[in-house]
Regions:
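Calcium-regulated, polybasic anionic-phospholipid
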Residues: 225-263
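Polybasic, proline/glycine-rich intrinsically disordered low-complexity segments
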Residues: 261-291, 327, 331-334, 338-341
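Long, charge-dense tracts
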Residues: 20-215
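C-terminal motif of bacterial Sec signal peptides marking the signal peptidase cleavage site
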Residues: 5-9
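Eukaryotic beta-sheet cores, primarily in C2 and C2-like/PH beta-sandwich modules
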Residues: 242, 272-314
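Bacterial signal peptide processing site
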Residues: 11-14
Length: 388
């Protein structure tokens, strides 16, 4: 499962790739690729059964397509796997940032014993569109027959899911978004934004700091908890990231930073990441908002980056003198991002998790609820001395 925002709008030139496909059409093409692979795996299960049983375990419920190709590199099925993986990466705009993406994943650890004891599995894929509209999950048995599974009730038979490796996808997706945002004029994101801990942030800053580098003001995410993660069983673990939004201190341009949260997998569980999430030299008025997102399987990351920048810049263009309104502008930017990104960019519109409005520099927030009440977090100010 992966976090993102629900967005409304019409299809336009901005939601089309260089190939002319709309984002919805690209998402449908991704699903079609996975459907074909699920059917092919069902028909070729005997050829891969040994490899799967030696690689799949309680500690590792998935195997990458590249590993399956290595087990039989010269077969027609391996050629299909290579081609599908390349196509999906291209459709999602991340081909330049990862060499492999697809995997075969056992849907739940509870299925492992029965499968290892000889129960034939089904092979499924995630449908297209918003999961609220899904009527069933399609899965193929080893005879090529289609079964219709309940969307939310975990099946009582082993099911392998043809899926994206969500961690690989999110990492590559954020890289693609950062590159596209920088191309569109956003100032480069500082290294602390990409670090998972205070220690890593400090080491990264120290490597490039001179002896007279000034202390750096940041805000650290000390604790976070999600209340409800209503995802179908086929979607697997959540992959959460955040958008930190604000205004550039030196020009009338928005600042949008992307924060990876690879640890935040499940709801109703406390996490203590000690992660630097805001670097205050990038934000005017010492104020910023933070939107929590769930990665969407249908996301085209380059198009999403374009839309984020476009929407934020349009808000600022409507305000002649930002200093008059001050940091109240930030909530307008955040609100437009949540409301205005077209449904064609994020085809599964259940992805907005929560938002923290008006986080202030040098301010501590303890068990601070998000505006939707779905997330609770503790933030603390931290001054980093890079040369120490």
């Amino acid at each position: 499962m992966l976090l993102t925002v629900a967005l409304v709008g019409c299809q336009s030139e901005e939601t089309q790739s260089n190939t002319g496909l709309t984002a919805q059409a690209k998402a449908d093409a991704v699903v079609a690729q996975k459907r074909q692979l699920a059917e092919s795996f069902s028909q070729n299960y005997a050829a891969y059964a040994h490899t799967l049983k030696t690689q799949i375990s309680a500690d590792n419920l998935s195997i990458s397509v590249s590993e399956l190709v290595e087990s039989a590199p010269n077969t027609e099925m391996s050629q299909q796997l290579r081609s599908a993986d390349k196509n999906v990466r291209t459709l999602k705009g991340i081909d330049q940032f990862t060499e492999q993406l697809l995997q075969l994943r056992l849907a739940d650890a509870s299925m492992l014993k029965e499968w290892q004891e000889g129960q034939s599995p089904l092979f499924a894929f995630e449908p297209s569109g918003n999961d609220d509209s899904w009527q069933y999950i399609e899965a193929y048995d080893v005879y090529g027959q289609i079964h219709q599974l309940d969307v939310y009730q975990l099946p009582d038979v082993p099911v392998f899911v043809v899926d994206n490796d969500s961690a690989v996808e999110l990492k590559a997706g954020l890289q693609a978004m950062r590159a596209e945002m920088q191309r569109l004029g956003q100032s480069p994101q500082l290294s602390t934004q990409e670090s998972s801990s205070i220690e890593a942030s400090t080491r990264s800053l120290s490597r490039s700091a001179s002896a007279d580098t000034a202390p750096i003001s940041t805000t650290v995410l000390k604790k976070i908890r999600l209340q409800d993660d209503k995802e179908p069983w086929i979607s697997g673990r959540a992959e959460i990231y955040a958008l930190v939004t604000g205004v550039d201190p030196s020009r009338d341009k928005p600042t949008i930073d992307l924060i990876d949260m690879p640890y935040l997998d499940y709801d109703k569980q406390d996490y203590f990441p000690n992660q630097v999430v805001i670097h205050w030299t990038r934000y005017r008025w010492g104020a910023a908002d933070m939107i929590l997102m769930e990665q969407d399987d249908g996301t085209d990351y380059k198009e999403l980056a374009k839309q984020l920048v476009k929407v934020a810049e349009e808000v600022l263009k409507l305000i002649p003198d930002p200093e008059v309104q001050g940091y109240a502008i930030i909530a307008q930017i955040t609100g437009k991002i949540i409301e205005a990104i077209p449904d064609g960019v994020l085809v599964n519109d259940d992805d907005f998790v929560d938002v923290f409005y008006t986080l202030m520099q040098d301010t501590q927030y303890t068990d601070h609820p998000g505006a939707n009440g779905n997330a609770t977090a503790t933030f603390e100010p931290l001054t980093i001395y890079p040369t120490k």
